[in-house]
Amino acid sequence: MVVYNTLTRRKEVFQPLAAGGSQSVSVGNSQGSAAPVAEEKPLVRMYVCGVTVYDLCHLGHARTYVVWDMVRRYLEWRGYRVKYVQNFTDVDDKILKRALERGESMQAVAERFIAEYFRDMDCLNIKRADFYPRATQSLQAMFQLIQSLELKGFAYRVRDPIRHQTDQSSLLQAGHQPETPASVQYSVYYSVRKFPDYGQLSGRKLEEMEAGASGRVGEEGAEKQDPFDFALWKAAPPSEPGFASPWGWGRPGWHIECSAMVRETLGDHIDIHAGGADLIFPHHENELAQSEPITGKPMAKYWMHNGFLNINGEKMSKSLGNFTTLRQALAVYHPMALRLFLLQTHYRSPIDLTEAAMQAASRGWETLQKGIHCAQHFCKEEKGSPDAEAMQAFQAAMDNDFGTPEALAIAFELAKELTREHNLFTHQGQTHLEPQALKQKSAALLEILATLGFCWPSFSEFEGSKEAATNGELNFKKIEELIAQRSAARKAKNFSEADRIRDQLKALGITLIDQKDGTTRWLRE
């Protein structure tokens, strides 16, 4: 199995740190998970940079987290035990701006959009991380890292004579004025020229870089020793949200947050550090530079990055104003059609979002759904072991740096073949393939799609939805009644009942889309 390492700019044999020199992977079994060679599954420690929680997720976010969900699932299928960590950046100038616009605290804004994040990702069947650390919960780890960098000569202070907050525990809310005397406090910067390997991840040289590119914290070039230095800690006015620190009142720099959270949750040396290609520089470059002088170890063995999702040739981003929220897309397209669209292109290549491409993905998902139903029909009494030839081809595709386009091509061939066989059986009462071969191909299709993170109703649910629709039971009035019951359950905080109703409707081919104003839209799948 090989993966592309951004650090070395080549594909490398995947060998996790915990595996040593032993063989540690094997072919998946019929239950969708791989049987490891060793009794103890080799551990893969994987960190993915998460969202800054000030707005709804856009389709660029969807691509990132579908990709790394796919990678995680495949590693688990191959027999690894993945410890998957993904952070939330819950202190940031963008969150502060949104909080001031709405007259809320940064914490309230962050909490709301964390909840919205989970709603969106659940629609795409993205597995929950093992840990979701937050920047505001890792302050002590940040302080320790910054102090260590100061002691080793990699960081320096810049005096900032503004009032500071001395309370070591409270988060200052926007507009609150602490009654403390004026004092001196500091910003702390990382000196990039002290780290000889700076630029190794991005392949850039200092003289070619753009000064101030880390601009998450509004750095003023005049106060830095070098224009390329970046903030570890930035002093803040007492009227702004912030934290008490060894350097006075302020907020952490963007990059130190992830370094601290990686170290707290996974240790000094991890297997995979992943994120979007836009994070290679400056974020991941700076993470590496500020972590390795402290630990004396490479921060990650494999640095992995997914390509952009483009609109009209430009990366989708909020800063460019060309983004479509995931919520908007889910109001039009089936979640699994969207997942299919995002995985039909290799994860390192850019994707161009067009209406034609999404319509093609929707038709593709319909093809796969037909194949799934046929596979469920052939396997309804007894599930066979998956077809060996198909599974070997799937593994060969995925072992080559997670080749999902080739893997999905195998799934489409199986789906079409099973649909042909099912149609033949329906009209003529016979099939070309023997029953055992049909079961094996059916099991292969279901296992491949499950490993790639697709989900679908069970056979009984599928048949039940068809029968209900035929009998006229799934009419507009019934749908609206169930939605009203679900809304009442949510208001009563009976979330298990609300989820049961949502799942009941989903099994009947109805997708619910909760709106910002509290109403709920529904779509037939």
Swiss-Prot record:
<feature type="short sequence motif" description="'HIGH' region">
    <location>
        <begin position="51"/>
        <end position="61"/>
    </location>
</feature>
<dbReference type="GO" id="GO:0004817">
    <property type="term" value="F:cysteine-tRNA ligase activity"/>
</dbReference>
<keyword id="KW-0030">Aminoacyl-tRNA synthetase</keyword>
<keyword id="KW-0479">Metal-binding</keyword>
<feature type="binding site">
    <location>
        <position position="283"/>
    </location>
    <ligand>
        <name>Zn(2+)</name>
    </ligand>
</feature>
<keyword id="KW-0436">Ligase</keyword>
<dbReference type="GO" id="GO:0008270">
    <property type="term" value="F:zinc ion binding"/>
</dbReference>
<dbReference type="InterPro" id="IPR056411">
    <property type="entry name" value="CysS_C"/>
</dbReference>
<keyword id="KW-0963">Cytoplasm</keyword>
<feature type="short sequence motif" description="'KMSKS' region">
    <location>
        <begin position="315"/>
        <end position="319"/>
    </location>
</feature>
<dbReference type="InterPro" id="IPR015273">
    <property type="entry name" value="Cys-tRNA-synt_Ia_DALR"/>
</dbReference>
<dbReference type="GO" id="GO:0006423">
    <property type="term" value="P:cysteinyl-tRNA aminoacylation"/>
</dbReference>
<dbReference type="InterPro" id="IPR014729">
    <property type="entry name" value="Rossmann-like_a/b/a_fold"/>
</dbReference>
<feature type="binding site">
    <location>
        <position position="258"/>
    </location>
    <ligand>
        <name>Zn(2+)</name>
    </ligand>
</feature>
<dbReference type="InterPro" id="IPR032678">
    <property type="entry name" value="tRNA-synt_1_cat_dom"/>
</dbReference>
<dbReference type="Pfam" id="PF09190">
    <property type="entry name" value="DALR_2"/>
</dbReference>
<comment type="similarity">
    <text>Belongs to the class-I aminoacyl-tRNA synthetase family.</text>
</comment>
<dbReference type="GO" id="GO:0005524">
    <property type="term" value="F:ATP binding"/>
</dbReference>
<feature type="binding site">
    <location>
        <position position="49"/>
    </location>
    <ligand>
        <name>Zn(2+)</name>
    </ligand>
</feature>
<dbReference type="Pfam" id="PF23493">
    <property type="entry name" value="CysS_C"/>
</dbReference>
<keyword id="KW-0648">Protein biosynthesis</keyword>
<feature type="binding site">
    <location>
        <position position="318"/>
    </location>
    <ligand>
        <name>ATP</name>
    </ligand>
</feature>
<keyword id="KW-0547">Nucleotide-binding</keyword>
<protein>
    <recommendedName>
        <fullName>Cysteine--tRNA ligase</fullName>
        <ecNumber>6.1.1.16</ecNumber>
    </recommendedName>
</protein>
<dbReference type="Pfam" id="PF01406">
    <property type="entry name" value="tRNA-synt_1e"/>
</dbReference>
<dbReference type="InterPro" id="IPR015803">
    <property type="entry name" value="Cys-tRNA-ligase"/>
</dbReference>
<dbReference type="GO" id="GO:0005829">
    <property type="term" value="C:cytosol"/>
</dbReference>
<comment type="subunit">
    <text>Monomer.</text>
</comment>
<feature type="binding site">
    <location>
        <position position="287"/>
    </location>
    <ligand>
        <name>Zn(2+)</name>
    </ligand>
</feature>
<keyword id="KW-0067">ATP-binding</keyword>
<keyword id="KW-0862">Zinc</keyword>
<dbReference type="InterPro" id="IPR024909">
    <property type="entry name" value="Cys-tRNA/MSH_ligase"/>
</dbReference>
<dbReference type="InterPro" id="IPR009080">
    <property type="entry name" value="tRNAsynth_Ia_anticodon-bd"/>
</dbReference>
